[in-house]
């Protein structure tokens, strides 16, 4: 059989494979941590640099926009150039750009840094996943490795605000960026000695598809940007509508071009495989259902429980604990009972956690939330099985494609979930609050608008006017909107579990490569 892939993993011992996995897991941890750590640094950054409201949004959003746009082309680039070189280059860029924060004296400079960090992240994130596919050719070992990879991603996202809060208690906002530097140095040095190189052979590595690159970047960035705009400004603005139509058009052209190509940047035909489709649907829709609920949980802890952002991060740890406990055993359960049982069941367990928040959440207590978060984390651990399904029927030469698709599904699910379910929560909050009942007390015009926009705004208006009842009703309305959104998220996850169950072949064994 002709090999289209050049790799140096054949002689790797078991010890070297698992040591390499540690490097890849730490790499992913750092990048996902960086996606959330800025939340803690933003208030101090705003006080020092005084960015405009628009600049603040770009500081927050530019990272995810660039990540979404560049993941597919840069994963294809890594396949051709070499995954090890791409990963180490990504980390070198990650460290150098983070170090440049020392020279940041304007919001524009910080935006540029976040842009370059997004490029580096797009080199790192899919490459960690595709290298696991190359290093662990035994499907059973690979499933366990993917569980570790999944844990690293979850822990990074949860610990970002916690680490950020701890740093900011002692240092300036710059530390939220500088924390990346030692991790980047360690990753580059360790990667040089511990990671194997792998890339497409010359027979398979053809010329670079520039039109597909442009279509992918512009289409994905346009799609993510427009969805974010809808969630912030509503549906009335015409510009996001124009952008989303153009973005979808470019994505459709990209798909058609790659379907007709003998050497596609993204092999769209992978979606014809039921296990691949099941894994990607699970990744996208689970993040869609979860993202807004977790964001609202953080707000609930800060507004209702009156915790600092740092303590709120600590109080979200039960979810990470649930994930860490169950992710390592999920592949073993899937090997014994089959992914057709384990993945839908895991998603169902996460749904139960959501339902608990609703049915025992009037009002919600932290003990109830903690139990729900443990179940959500335990259920999310089953997504390691989704990763195994995605890689199971993916040939080694298409590992970069599969990794890019999976990462894109997580990112898009997060963006769409926050936009759609976040907007639902805001709408329910306004319905439950009934601000008109406070008109007789002077809460009209701009004051009423601020109170209706968010629970934080309502609390501030209540403090300014001395109307304590407004704060109490706003908090109650936010609580009810939050748990109602959790109910909707749980229903979505039940539907996902059924769809995934129907898609996964009954006899599929994740310990045997297709």
Swiss-Prot record:
PANTHER family: MAJOR FACILITATOR SUPERFAMILY MULTIDRUG TRANSPORTER MFSC, METHYL VIOLOGEN RESISTANCE PROTEIN SMVA. Keywords: Antibiotic resistance, Cell membrane, Membrane, Plasmid, Transmembrane, Transmembrane helix, Transport. The chain crosses the membrane at residues 24-41, 58-75, 87-104, 113-130, 147-164, 173-190, 208-225, 238-255, 279-295, 316-333, 342-360, 370-387, 409-426, 482-499. CDD domains: MFS_MMR_MDR_like (cd17321). The keyword Membrane applies. InterPro entries: MFS (IPR011701), MFS_dom (IPR020846), MFS_trans_sf (IPR036259), Sugar_transporter_CS (IPR005829). Pfam families: MFS_1. Residues 42-57, 105-112, 165-172, 226-237, 296-315, 361-369, 427-481 are extracellular. One of its GO terms (biological process) is response to antibiotic. PROSITE patterns: MFS, SUGAR_TRANSPORT_1. It comes from the Bacteria. The keyword Nucleotidyltransferase does not apply. It is a multi-pass membrane protein. Belongs to the major facilitator superfamily. Residues 1-23, 76-86, 131-146, 191-207, 256-278, 334-341, 388-408, 500-514 are cytoplasmic. Its main location: membrane. This is Antiseptic resistance protein.
């Amino acid at each position: 059989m002709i090999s289209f892939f050049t790799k140096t993993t054949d002689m790797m011992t078991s010890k070297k494979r698992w040591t390499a996995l540690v490097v890849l897991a730490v790499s992913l941890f750092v990048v996902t941590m960086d996606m959330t750590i800025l939340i803690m640094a933003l208030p101090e950054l705003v006080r020092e640099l005084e960015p405009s409201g628009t600049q603040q949004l770009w500081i927050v959003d530019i990272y995810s926009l660039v990540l979404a746009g560049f993941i597919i082309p840069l994963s294809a680039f890594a396949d051709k150039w070499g995954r090890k070189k791409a990963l180490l280059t990504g980390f070198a860029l990650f460290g150098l750009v983070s170090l440049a924060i020392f020279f940041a004296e304007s919001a524009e400079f910080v935006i540029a840094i976040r842009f370059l960090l997004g490029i580096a992240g797009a080199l790192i994130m899919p490459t960690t996943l595709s290298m696991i596919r190359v290093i662990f050719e035994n499907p059973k070992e690979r499933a366990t490795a993917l569980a570790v990879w999944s844990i690293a991603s979850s822990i990074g996202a949860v610990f970002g605000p916690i680490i950020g809060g701890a740093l900011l208690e002692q240092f300036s906002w710059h530390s939220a960026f500088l924390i990346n530097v030692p991790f980047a140095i360690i990753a580059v040095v360790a990667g040089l000695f511990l990671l194997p190189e792998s890339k497409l052979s010359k027979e398979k590595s053809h010329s670079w598809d520039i039109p597909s690159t442009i279509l992918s970047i512009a289409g994905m960035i346009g799609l993510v940007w427009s969805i974010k705009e809808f969630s912030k400004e509503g549906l009335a603005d015409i510009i996001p509508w124009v952008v989303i139509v153009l973005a979808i058009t470019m994505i459709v052209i990209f798909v058609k071009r790659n379907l007709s190509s003998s050497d596609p940047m993204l092999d769209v035909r992978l979606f014809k495989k039921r296990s691949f489709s099941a894994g990607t649907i699970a990744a996208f829709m689970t993040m869609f259902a979860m993202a807004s609920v977790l964001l609202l949980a953080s707000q609930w802890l800060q507004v209702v429980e009156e915790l600092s952002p740092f303590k709120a991060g600590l109080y979200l740890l039960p979810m990470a604990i649930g994930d860490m406990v169950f992710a390592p055993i999920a592949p073993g359960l899937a090997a014994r009972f089959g992914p057709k049982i384990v993945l839908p069941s895991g998603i169902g367990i996460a749904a139960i956690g959501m339902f608990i928040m609703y049915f025992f959440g009037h009002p919600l207590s932290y003990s109830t939330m903690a139990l729900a978060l443990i179940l959500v984390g335990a259920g999310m651990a089953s997504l390691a099985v989704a990763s195994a399904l995605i890689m199971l029927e993916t040939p080694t030469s298409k590992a970069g494609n599969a990794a890019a698709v999976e990462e894109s599904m997580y990112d898009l699910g997060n963006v769409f979930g926050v936009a759609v379910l976040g907007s639902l929560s805001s709408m329910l909050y306004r319905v439950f609050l009934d601000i008109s009942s406070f008109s007789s007390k002077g809460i009209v015009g701009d004051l009423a608008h601020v109170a209706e926009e968010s629970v934080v705004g309502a609390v501030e208006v209540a403090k300014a006017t001395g109307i304590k009842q407004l704060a109490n009703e706003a908090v109650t309305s936010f609580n009810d909107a939050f748990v109602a959104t959790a109910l909707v998220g749980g229903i979505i996850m039940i539907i996902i579990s059924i769809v995934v169950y129907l898609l996964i072949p009954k006899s599929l064994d994740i310990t045997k490569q297709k």
